[in-house]
Amino acid sequence: MVSLEKNDHLMLARQLPLKSVALILAGGRGTRLKDLTNKRAKPAVHFGGKFRIIDFALSNCINSGIRRMGVITQYQSHTLVQHIQRGWSFFNEEMNEFVDLLPAQQRMKGENWYRGTADAVTQNLDIIRRYKAEYVVILAGDHIYKQDYSRMLIDHVEKGARCTVACMPVPIEEASAFGVMAVDENDKIIEFVEKPANPPSMPNDPSKSLASMGIYVFDADYLYELLEEDDRDKNSSHDFGKDLIPKITEAGLAYAHPFPLSCVQSDPDAEPYWRDVGTLEAYWKANLDLASVVPELDMYDRNWPIRTYNESLPPAKFVQDRSGSHGMTLNSLVSGGCVISGSVVVQSVLFSRVRVNSFCNIDSAVLLPEVWVGRSCRLRRCVIDRACVIPEGMVIGENAEEDARRFYRSEEGIVLVTREMLRKLGHKQER
């Protein structure tokens, strides 16, 4: 383990990101989000009024000083590719800055699509090697968080690790969804189990387990060697969590990086924020939290901006209708191009170009871009997919049986509405 002075830290914080390439795994479908991911990959799902989920990993890279990135895509990638081409094309190739799109092209075998997260990198090794990076940062493109990867890179170098895994405590009842680890006093990982049925607890807190966040830093040459070995292993599922990390742990070369050390937050006393918005309820809840008075995730931090594609739109407009009813909002996010006419919107998130017509009541709802809400509608505890046309007088979120019959209703009572569902009910979706 190497001990560094403050000046050395500052120098490494500048140098290490320049020696690194980030690979963002963005090919997942996100089946737990149900019909919301029927036509788009989970990283391309809208979030927070104007962003896509992948914008958080990409913005973290830029803000951390990493300006060489590869985005590995597979499932329903068109929307994601289009978003990156439109919103992330500002890099200077002459300065060796880029975002490479790496779709599944069956390069290595001629038969297989990506068989697992590790195989997604293996199939692109010929391209990745050309980057000539010293360190490779592996990221999931479907999580919401703010992290300074330069701090994790410093931790990796200080500990003399070949592989570093970002981790954080999670409630033990939720830990079966993650890789779970045990560490020694120097943060060396001494045990790693992927998605255990009975997750082990932390020694100092029996109510929690130490979970992998799916964020890794590797020495580049070591990673390439591991991937080639794994590709030859016919018994491997070719996955980082299931195969590579346990193998590295057994060799004594994996270290843990506590997420609070690199989490970026405006309030140092706040709990570190990281969300896998993989279920409809988690997605709905994380969006609505941004509309609260003091949200858990600070989106207004000028020192750590979240970038995205910014369409040229007019400002949001709140107008009274012909009867004199005023368009009003409270504790809500309303994006550009929206028009609220003689209706009330409370504790909701409205993405761009949403139109809410007269006499409506919108409460605790997430409306994706270009949704049209007809007159006299009541929408509660719901997510309305892009470009849905909600017919006049429709009520959603007040009758559990009716919601479940017409749409998708989660166990927690969150209703998902899509254009296809509305068409099946006989409602035209063209305006």
From Swiss-Prot:
Keywords: Allosteric enzyme, ATP-binding, Carbohydrate metabolism, Glycogen biosynthesis, Glycogen metabolism, Nucleotide-binding, Nucleotidyltransferase, Transferase
Alphabetized PROSITE patterns for the sequence: ADP_GLC_PYROPHOSPH_1, ADP_GLC_PYROPHOSPH_2, ADP_GLC_PYROPHOSPH_3
GO molecular function, one term: glucose-1-phosphate adenylyltransferase activity
Gene Ontology biological process terms, A to Z: glycogen biosynthetic process
CDD domains: ADP_Glucose_PP (cd02508), LbH_G1P_AT_C (cd04651)
Residues annotated as site: Could play a key role in the communication between the regulatory and the substrate sites: Q74, W113
EC number: 2.7.7.27
Catalysis performed (reactions): alpha-D-glucose 1-phosphate + ATP + H(+) = ADP-alpha-D-glucose + diphosphate
PANTHER family the UniProt entry points to: GLUCOSE-1-PHOSPHATE ADENYLYLTRANSFERASE (PTHR43523:SF2), GLUCOSE-1-PHOSPHATE ADENYLYLTRANSFERASE-RELATED (PTHR43523)
Protein name: Glucose-1-phosphate adenylyltransferase
Species whose genome carries this gene: Escherichia coli O7:K1 (strain IAI39 / ExPEC)
